[in-house]
UniProtKB/Swiss-Prot annotation:
UniProt keywords, alphabetically: ATP synthesis, Cell membrane, CF(0), Hydrogen ion transport, Ion transport, Membrane, Transmembrane, Transmembrane helix, Transport
A GO cellular-component term linked to this record: proton-transporting ATP synthase complex
Protein name, entry field: ATP synthase subunit a
Domain of life the protein comes from: Bacteria
Membrane-topology descriptor: Multi-pass membrane protein
Assembly notes: F-type ATPases have 2 components, CF(1) - the catalytic core - and CF(0) - the membrane proton channel. CF(1) has five subunits: alpha(3), beta(3), gamma(1), delta(1), epsilon(1). CF(0) has three main subunits: a(1), b(2) and c(9-12). The alpha and beta chains form an alternating ring which encloses part of the gamma chain. CF(1) is attached to CF(0) by a central stalk formed by the gamma and epsilon chains, while a peripheral stalk is formed by the delta and b chains.
Entries under NCBIfam families matching the protein: ATP_synt_6_or_A, PRK05815.1-4
InterPro entries xref list: ATP_syn_F0_a_bact/chloroplast, ATP_synth_F0_asu, ATP_synth_F0_asu_AS, F0_ATP_A_sf
PANTHER family linked to this entry: ATP SYNTHASE SUBUNIT A, CHLOROPLASTIC
CDD domains listed in its UniProt record: ATP-synt_Fo_a_6 (cd00310)
Length: 238
């Protein structure tokens, strides 16, 4: 298990984890296809996939309304939908199994969110968007004034908070998904070590997969919810 490593490719002096690139692409395609198929033939009496997607949208609408006024927050429903759905699918991809090259020991099929580079990039993207919409909605002057309100002494702490938000948002997702996959690999390794190991690891593996489903769903919710919390802090006056 310890010999497993990511497939790294160099391009223009930069290193790319090709497993993360592959699995991110697959997760995006799954989200796109489900959304496209579910909304291709909209009906006033929804059923099946359309009914499920409408439930997801209503759930996301509730997250936004809990954090900001809908007149302001309504524009972020597509962003929240994409974050929630993508993170959930990405978390689930490594749940049933992992695939690796037995010759090179490179892991190809896994949850892309078990890569800290991806989760921190997503977190940075969210934080940058909050600044963009904060300036767009409030105006540059009023937005900057928020950093010295109610007292200018808070300025350095609010700057530190921006970096802390990025770090915690990304590392929380990475840490939970990575721990889930590490324990799953341990159980699979034990299950393939022999007949006794197979029977001993079977039930814990099933239980942990069920718990992994719960972890993946909760982390997707937390990521989307915190994204809307950070957005509300920037676009609404306090």
């Amino acid at each position: 298990m310890n010999d497993h490593k990511p497939p790294i490719e160099e391009f223009m002096g930069l290193s790319f984890n090709m497993s993360t690139v592959l699995m991110t692409t697959i997760a995006c395609l799954i989200v796109f296809l489900i959304t496209f198929i579910g909304t291709r033939r909209l009906s006033m009496n929804p059923s099946g996939l359309q009914n499920f997607l409408e439930w997801v949208v209503d759930f996301i609408r509730g997250i936004i309304k809990a954090n900001m006024d809908w007149k302001v927050g309504g524009r972020f429903i597509v962003l929240a939908y994409a974050l929630l759905f993508y993170v959930f699918v990405a978390n689930m991809l490594g749940l049933p199994f992992e695939l690796y090259n037995p010759t090179t020991h490179e892991v190809w099929w896994k949850s892309p969110t078990s890569d800290p580079v991806l989760t921190l990039t997503m977190a940075a993207f969210v934080v940058i968007l909050t600044h963009y919409y904060g300036i767009k909605i409030q105006g540059f002057g009023k937005y900057l004034k928020g950093y010295i309100t109610p007292v200018p002494f808070l300025l350095p702490f609010k700057i530190i908070e921006e970096f802390a938000n990025t770090l915690t948002l990304g590392m929380r997702l990475f840490g939970n998904v990575y721990a889930k996959e590490i324990l799953m690999i341990l159980l699979v390794t034990a299950g393939t070590s022999g007949l006794i190991g197979m029977f001993g690891a079977f039930l814990p593996l099933i239980v942990w997969q069920a718990f992994g489903l719960f972890i993946g769903a909760i982390q997707a919710y937390i990521f989307a919810m915190l994204a809307m919390v950070y957005m509300a802090h920037k676009v609404e006056s306090h």
